[in-house]
């Protein structure tokens, strides 16, 4: 058990170190300017950014609680908050592979079977994706003319990214809620090579999808849960999209209004959600600079990106490490008690 905890510390430390090194390499040309810009950021501004970052995770926990209450009404907001931060920890330290197992294990300890736990987390993921699409669509309808007039070249690529992101969200939603789409995917699995290795993978992937579809449908097809979940998600996204605006202002960019940053941020999340990433890093940073550099020079946009990721990535990860270690300690106590 001690070796397992040591590995946890090592993985957490290495993850942060690698990300820090990557940031240094990416921004090495403008690093002096970034340091200069960040040195002028007031302390209250940093605190407000961190508060918004925590508020986003708290709203994510409210969404989780809405879904959990459908299965287990006695679960509390603190339970949902722990599930959320365990997800943050698993996504970063295990490159996403351990996210669902960590969250499902916690829910299992709270009295939910493994299938229900997986269904809850899958439902939360789908509701989040649906809300991202709704928010981006409304923002684009309201601000599309401004985007076309102020950045026509960029708008063309953003529209393509929007369409691709929308198609992925729709396909994902149908996969979890419509049996015909699930049957189609399972049929495609049968086209994979007929070898022992691929047969094992096909069986594993197919059974996982069937289980997720079965459990997620129990939640997603309940109107009250669906409506409340999307409402909470939209409010959560409003908080998230407010962080780039504050980061840009603190870095010295005043060319964009609050509504314009909301539009660009909503498109940024929709597009990057459809792209592969490593531990939540890569596409988001690229998209942030691509979208906001036209209205701020590279150094200011890069400084704003650092502030944004501190609030939405590093700070939540730090909190998630604390939550994980506390939950691991409780698990070890329970294991020792059973052994005795």
Regions flagged by a language model, labelled:
Residues 46-50, 77, 81-82, 118, ...:
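Hydrophobic alpha-helical transmembrane segments
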Residues 216-267, 275:
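Transmembrane helical segments that form the transport core of multi-pass membrane transport proteins
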Residues 1-36, 87-199, 277, 281-340:
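Transmembrane helix-loop-helix hairpins in multi-pass inner-membrane proteins
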Residues 49-56, 87-91, 128, 232-236, ...:
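Alpha-helical transmembrane segments of multi-pass integral membrane proteins
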Residues 5-6, 42-44, 73-82, 113-114, ...:
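Membrane-helix interface segments
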Residues 32-38, 208-221:
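A short amphipathic helical element positioned immediately N-terminal to and/or at the very start
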């Amino acid at each position: 058990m001690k070796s397992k905890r040591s590995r946890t510390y090592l993985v957490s430390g290495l993850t942060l170190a690698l990300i820090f090194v990557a940031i240094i390499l990416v921004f090495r040309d403008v690093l002096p300017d970034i340091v200069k810009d960040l040195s002028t950021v007031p302390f209250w501004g940093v605190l407000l950014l961190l508060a918004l970052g925590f508020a986003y995770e708290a709203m994510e926990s409210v969404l989780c609680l809405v879904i959990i209450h459908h299965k287990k009404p006695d679960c509390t907001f603190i339970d949902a908050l722990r599930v959320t931060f365990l997800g943050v920890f698993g996504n970063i330290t295990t490159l996403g592979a351990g996210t669902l197992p960590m969250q499902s294990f916690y829910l299992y300890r709270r009295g939910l079977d493994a299938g229900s736990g997986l269904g809850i987390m899958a439902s939360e993921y789908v509701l989040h994706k649906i809300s991202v699409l709704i928010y981006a669509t409304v923002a684009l309808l309201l601000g599309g003319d401004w985007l076309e007039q102020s950045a026509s070249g960029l708008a063309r690529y953003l529209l393509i990214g929007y369409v691709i992101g929308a198609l992925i969200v729709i396909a994902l939603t149908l996969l979890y809620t419509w049996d015909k789409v699930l049957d189609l995917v399972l049929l495609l699995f049968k086209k994979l090579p007929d070898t022992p290795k691929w047969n094992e993978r096909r069986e594993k992937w197919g059974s996982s999808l069937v289980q997720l579809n079965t459990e997620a449908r129990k939640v997603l097809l309940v109107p009250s849960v669906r409506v409340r979940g999307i409402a909470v998600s939209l409010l959560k996204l409003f908080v998230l999209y407010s962080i780039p605006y504050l980061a840009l202002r603190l870095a010295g960019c005043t060319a964009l209004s609050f509504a314009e940053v909301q539009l660009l941020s909503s498109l940024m999340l929709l597009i990057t959600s459809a792209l592969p990433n490593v531990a939540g890093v890569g596409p988001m940073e690229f998209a942030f600079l691509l979208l906001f550099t036209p209205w701020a020079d590279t150094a200011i946009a890069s400084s704003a990106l650092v502030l944004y990721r501190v609030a939405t990535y590093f700070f939540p990860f730090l909190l998630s490490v604390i939550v994980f270690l506390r939950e691991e300690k409780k698990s070890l106590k329970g294991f020792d008690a059973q052994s005795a």
